[in-house]
Amino acid sequence: METLTAISRWLAKQHVVTWCVQQEGELWCANAFYLFDVQKVAFYILTEEKTRHAQMRGPQAAVAGTVNGQPKTVALIRGVQFKGEIRRLEGEESDLARKAYNRRFPVARMLSAPVWEIRPDEIKFTDNTLGFGKKMIWLRGSGTEQA
């Protein structure tokens, strides 16, 4: 199975991303509901400007994070680790992402928080259901996939 396809299928079944930013050596992580766009290979989240993590990252910053389930046995562990960039969307780009986000999470229509895009450069998918420690790696722009 193609790596990005496997990753995207699994991410479509999840809904919370943990992402971390740093500023001047200080790290901070946050959780958010996400929409994953398989075409752009990007997560879309809503978060207020006044939050600690938004203040630390500014309009654009390096980011790392995870998405994981909560299995009760090691044999069922599946999860994603990623690194990339986060940026606040503006204008039409923000409007389009918000419409898609609201379709997945209708309650978000009541929120005015800005839309942010997490654009991973690298994604590592661990899937123990395919064998203990099975990992698949996707790298943006490399044209290569590692399994």
From Swiss-Prot:
Signal peptide limits: none
InterPro entries, A to Z: Split_barrel_FMN-bd (IPR012349), UPF0306 (IPR011194)
Domain of life: Bacteria
Family: Belongs to the UPF0306 family.
UniProt-recorded name of the protein: UPF0306 protein YhbP
